[in-house]
Each structure stands twice: as C-alpha cells, then as structure tokens.
Amino acid sequence: MHFRDFNYNFSSLIACVANGDVFSESETRAKFESLFRTYDKDITFQYFKSFKRVRINFSNPLSAADARLQLHKTEFLGKEMKLYFAQTLHIGSSHLAPPNPDKQFLISPPASPPVGWKQVEDATPVINYDLLYAISKLGPGEKYELHAATDTTPSVVVHVCESDQENEEEEEMERMKRPKPKIIQTRRPEYTPIHLS
C-alpha cells in the first residue's frame, strides 16, 4: 500500500470565508481579491462555494506567508476570515495499488488454492421428522401432542387450522347475486378532415 505524504504548498493559501456574498456578488468578490492583491500582483483565485473556501495562489511563497501573517483571523465584512497553507497530496503513483493477497481465490472451486486447501461439503438439511409425521396423521379439527408435559416444561401440541372453504363459498355466492355494472360506451367525437373543410 502506498503511504500518503502531505506536503504543504507554501505558495497557496486556503481562506475559510463565512460570508457567502463572496461567491455570488462581484463587488464583494472584488473587495476580497483587493485584500490579497496588495501582497502579490500575479495572484489567482479559485472559489469553492459549497465548501465556503477560496484557494489563493501566489507567485512566490514569501508573499503568501506575508499575507497569512497579516490577514489571518481578521474581519472581512463583519465575519472572521481564517487562512491556512494549502496541502497537496502525493500518493506516489497515479494507478491504484492492488489489494493485499490475503484471500484472492474463489471459494468453490478454487482457481489456484493455497497449499492444504480442501473442499468444504455442504451440510445436510435439518428435517424434523417428528413434526412431519405428526402433521401427516392430523385431520381437520384434531390435535397432536409432540412432547408430553413434565414438571419443568410444558407440552408441545400441534393444532391444524380449519379451512376457510365455507367463508369462500359464501363470498362467491354474494358475488354472483350482485348485478354486474353496466359499461356505457362513450361516443366518438365528431371528426372532419382538414382537407375536406
């Protein structure tokens, strides 16, 4: 993995501006830029509205340091302005580093497994045959006791739900008795072709 190395770029400052007018109004922006143009004539500004930051690029590090000493924590339009030296991030390479080779093999089947790797067999599913047997013996309205009660545990009893066939039949009879709604067709609007009129 590449180590990140933060280097300070002493010819650039980052200004934390609390007043949002710097980003929208040209007069306020001109006042802001004039504060720094006294320290360097060949200066450039980069405005980052969503971060409320302005990057100020000076032509030499001495003028940037002088501007920071004089203007750090000063008021601009009634709000405090803070100045910091800009950090540049050097990763070392412009390409992504490959991941660590801990587990770079497929689980099943492995393309190139490590030494001593063995295929893991799937476990058999757990089936409760007592429960299946009890359900197969039950009929509607009956119950089956899986485990008898003891002094410390309750008994486990399976009840079969009764079917809702009677309710379904009643609902179907009601549907048949209801009259079907009549669908009234709408008339087609009058149409006269343009070339005939």
Curated annotation (Swiss-Prot):
Function according to Swiss-Prot or TrEMBL: Inhibits calcineurin-dependent transcriptional responses by binding to the catalytic domain of calcineurin A. Could play a role during central nervous system development.
Region named Disordered: 163-197
Coiled-coil segments: none
Keyword tags: Phosphoprotein, Stress response
Biased composition (Acidic residues): 163-173
InterPro entries recorded: Calcipressin (IPR006931), Nucleotide-bd_a/b_plait_sf (IPR012677), RBD_domain_sf (IPR035979), RCAN1_RRM (IPR034906)
Molecular function, one GO term: nucleic acid binding
Gene name of the record: RCAN1
Modified residues (Phosphoserine): 108, 112, 163
Keyword Phosphoprotein: yes
Example GO biological process: negative regulation of calcineurin-NFAT signaling cascade
Name of this chain's protein: Calcipressin-1
Post-translational modification (record): Phosphorylation increases its ability to inhibit calcineurin and decreases protein half-life.
Stated family: Belongs to the RCAN family.
Organism listed in the record: Cricetulus griseus (Chinese hamster)
Presence of keyword Ribonucleoprotein: no
Binding partners and assembly: Interacts with RAF1, PPP3R1 and PPP3CA.
GO cellular component, one term: cytoplasm
Induction line: By oxidative stress.
